[in-house]
Amino acid sequence: MKHIRNFSIIAHIDHGKSTLSDRIIQICGGLTEREMAAQVLDSMDLERERGITIKAQSVTLDYKSQDGQTYQLNFIDTPGHVDFSYEVSRSLAACEGALLVVDAGQGVEAQTLANCYTALDMNLEVVPVLNKIDLPAADPDRVAQEIEDIVGIDATDAVRCSAKTGVGVPDILDRLVRDIPPPEGSPDAPLQALIIDSWFDNYLGVVSLVRIKNGTMRKGDKIKVMSTGQVYNADRLGIFTPKQIDRDVLNCGEVGWLVCAIKDILGAPVGDTLTLARQPAEKALPGFKKVKPQVYAGLFPISSDDYEAFRDALGKLSLNDASLFYEPESSTALGFGFRCGFLGLLHMEIIQERLEREYDLELITTAPTVVYEVETTAKETIYVDSPSKLPPLNNIQELREPIAECHMLMPQEYLGNVITLCIEKRGVQTNMVYHGNQVALTYEIPMAEVVLDFFDRLKSTSRGYASLDYGFKRFQTSDMVRVDVLINNERVDALALITHRDNSQYRGREFVEKMKELIPRQQFDIAIQAAIGNHIIARATVKQLRKNVLAKCYGGDVSRKKKLLQKQKDGKKRMKQVGNVELPQEAFLAILHVGKDSK
């Protein structure tokens, strides 16, 4: 036990977590030179393409330290994006310490702070590391001072390293062994194992990543899931050295994987406790608090035959991603599908891409909305996560929208731009602190504005230097309206959006113009209208295609021409009564981007 160290690597996006993990694996000889690849832990092809970490990965390595002892390091590489902060908090629950990696060129950023506070709340030992000292722009002394000012950890003797070149990485390992405490727990107590993560393997069924807090787990043990009381047989267990290695026993304090031939995806929920059937533990370990989705969107398969496959795919994915929420929903325009809850827009994009890639589905997404709290005239409080569920205007007493508290960090020269952006997003400033050249801003901004495109716009106004961390604060009364879209005088439920009354005129007009470009011209005029209740606020017309019926008349009587034109007109009129308009997939996607390019 004394020789086990469990730690996570936390940092802001692109500060070099995954590269540092590569170096640590290399130094400890987890993989041979031939098997080594850049960012070896980012195993999903989506992660490699976007160059970001999405899933936390765990690795067990043996490290010979300078005092001649061999230590077992269990470490978890975590994502840096604000949308995946739930992954980070789960990983931290399995550790006794964390490496806080900070880019020596860029300094402290918002996510660094957020993740670091999460670690400190869980009473973990935080070891600061200054990375990327090989860059010409690196200024480790200034950044060490910044860590002290902003985060409040003593960073004067922080390890300086360059994960890319490998300089200083052995020092990190020695510092780890010295500063991070060994796991507590007794090997003789009844087994308590925390499920940190689960995923579905087509051959093995459910594979769970567990951290043994007390007791030991052996191959062939009868294992009981504490929340459901079901008993399974531990068929295989082992560790990752990034490769899956089978072992016969997992000892107290270790992190490893377990296969119990669970077929049902709800068999081993993340955050649950496993114990032995013959001598169960008294009580379950404190799990993780369930995370509430911030953004909801409808996902619909393009062909309705895929509905079953789509349902299974969502089930398997939600096992792997505990923060995904879904329930069935049907729409007149799009058929059957699911209403899904996500932690943010990036999370939504990633889930959609994973469904399309890993499960070969073709999906349509409706515009994302946040959850509104509605008090009806009958004094009931209901939560609305989709525009179609909003009660009629005359039944609403008041509508409250969620407000997010946003913490932003940026260099001073971009302060003006960022404040302008926040005000445009209906934000209210609550705090502003200067730390040397950095400014920390706190704003309360409506969640609907944050999830739409705030992050992208923040990055572009500050040339990528500003960083953001946000969380739900409270519900607040506000004047929100539902804008419906009518095509040929028919409401299309999938296109409705909820927006603030001040922006409604503008959003409606822009929306209609955009739709006009996207709907292909038909044989008759198509009217596209945006309406609040029965009040039309914007309209555009897609002009019809028409054949030149007069081409065959050379000269001749005007009444002949009139007759032909009249006949064409009548034909178009008849078509318009029976014709319906097919909406292309681009039309739905364009709605997500309304307001992004135009401002």
Curated annotation (Swiss-Prot):
Residues the entry annotates as binding GTP: D14, H15, G16, K17, S18, T19, N131, K132, I133, D134
Q: What GO cellular component entries does it have?
A: plasma membrane
Tell me which Gene Ontology terms the entry assigns under biological process.
positive regulation of translation
The record's listing under InterPro entries reads: EF-4, EFG_III/V, EFG_V-like, EFTu-like_2, G_TR_CS, LepA_C_sf, LepA_CTD, LepA_IV
Instruction: Report how it sits in the membrane.
Output: Peripheral membrane protein
Catalytic activity reported: GTP + H2O = GDP + phosphate + H(+)
CDD domains per the UniProt record, alphabetical:
EF4_II, EF4_III, LepA, lepA_C
Asked whether the UniProt record includes Acetylation among its keywords, one would answer: no
Q: Which Pfam families match?
A: EFG_C, GTP_EFTU, GTP_EFTU_D2, LepA_C
GO molecular function terms noted in the UniProt entry:
GTP binding; GTPase activity; guanosine tetraphosphate binding; ribosome binding; translation elongation factor activity
Residue ranges of every copy of the tr-type G domain listed in the record? 2-184
Q: Which UniProt keywords apply?
A: Cell inner membrane, Cell membrane, GTP-binding, Hydrolase, Membrane, Nucleotide-binding, Protein biosynthesis
Q: What is its main location?
A: membrane
Where does the UniProt annotation locate this protein?
Answer: Cell inner membrane
E.C. designation(s): 3.6.5.n1
The UniProt entry's sequence similarity note says: Belongs to the TRAFAC class translation factor GTPase superfamily. Classic translation factor GTPase family. LepA subfamily.
Give the protein's function.
Answer: Required for accurate and efficient protein synthesis under certain stress conditions. May act as a fidelity factor of the translation reaction, by catalyzing a one-codon backward translocation of tRNAs on improperly translocated ribosomes. Back-translocation proceeds from a post-translocation (POST) complex to a pre-translocation (PRE) complex, thus giving elongation factor G a second chance to translocate the tRNAs correctly. Binds to ribosomes in a GTP-dependent manner.
Q: Which HAMAP family match?
A: LepA (MF_00071)
Output this protein's name: Elongation factor 4
What's the encoding gene here?
Answer: lepA
